Amino acid sequence: MFDYISAKDIANKWNISQRRVAIFCMEGRIKDAKKLGNMWLIPNTAEKPIDKRTIRYEKHKKIELKPFVKWVGGKGQLVAQLEKHIPANGEKVLTKYAEPFVGGGALLFNILSKYNFEEIYIGDINKELINAYNVVKNNVDELIKKLTEMQLAFVPMDENGRKYYYYTARDRFNALQITAETAVEKASLFIFLNKTCFNGLYRVNKKGQFNVPMGAYKNPTICDENNLRNVSEALQNVTIVCGDYSLSKDFIDKDTFVYLDPPYRPISETAGFTAYNADCFDDNEQIRLARFIDEINLSGAKIMLSNSDPQNVNPEDTFFEDLYKAYTINKVDATRAINSKGDSRGKIKELLICN
């Protein structure tokens, strides 16, 4: 016979959360554990299951998730390289993930497809983008209905009909304020414009109005119902915040993996596209971000930051080397548009900065 102790006691003994103990029990990874009502009982001689990575990888987990919008600076092409730098500390388990510049969420959705974090925080300063995340999470049926109606109306039209429809939708989007009553309509317009505008670009003028012209797509997929439903399910336990990246500070601790993907520092005059919103992310903002990273580094969090490599065009530019001299700076290959028109692309280096 075994002497049994509670999940709370074994959690304290193993220095992990009680919820994580329950997950191990449900997966059958704790030998002879048994459930009594709503409580798990564990033999007091049980051995802690070994996690070889900081987060638990499930080889047979979930359907692949994709970003539901295209976003400037999106990390779709870099996900495989980013994954290599997800920290691994043997049995050290990171249970929380934070992405304060979520954008299109390429790494977020890769992580949601493969890993189980107990708590996830995403944020962005773009209120239209965050509204879309919230609507996908909370009102996906209504959203799919509206996007399906838009797709059925827009795709069969000739060019003149499409132009009228597109610019009418753009005017409506710019005029519509986000409220509880308008959130779904605003999100549907946001996604429609993203799928049909030039180069999938999100750009606003000084008044904060979306001003990208219509793109030339033969048969755009405006409503990807399966992906939207899968993303909605995956977001149910994700905290979504609209605001400055510094708001994530209270969430971040020693058990957190943090990925920061801010607006990149321009490497040329034409590459400096940071008009995701009406505010500018200049060198002073890059310095403020570095100070924030210094703060969260003190918490014991594992940190990964992406940015441009100014030495692509100026080998003497040591801006980031000076700013992050206390960190490990890796250079990774990327293919980027090097002007705002998106018609000049090439292989360049980007920086991946880790603590």
Regions found by a protein language model. Name each.
Residues Q286-T335:
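Conserved Class I SAM-dependent methyltransferase catalytic core
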Residues N15-L41:
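Major-groove DNA-recognition helix of helix-turn-helix-type DNA-binding domains
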Residues L323-N355:
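Class I S-adenosyl-L-methionine
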Residues N44-K62:
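A short, Lys/Arg-enriched interface patch at domain edges and termini
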Residues E58-K96, A106-L107:
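S-adenosyl-L-methionine
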Residues K114-Q236, T274:
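Class I S-adenosyl-L-methionine-dependent methyltransferase module
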Residues L82, Y97-I111, I122-N126, Y133, ...:
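Conserved proline-anchored active-site loop of SAM-dependent methyltransferases
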Residues M1-R20:
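Polyanion-binding surface elements
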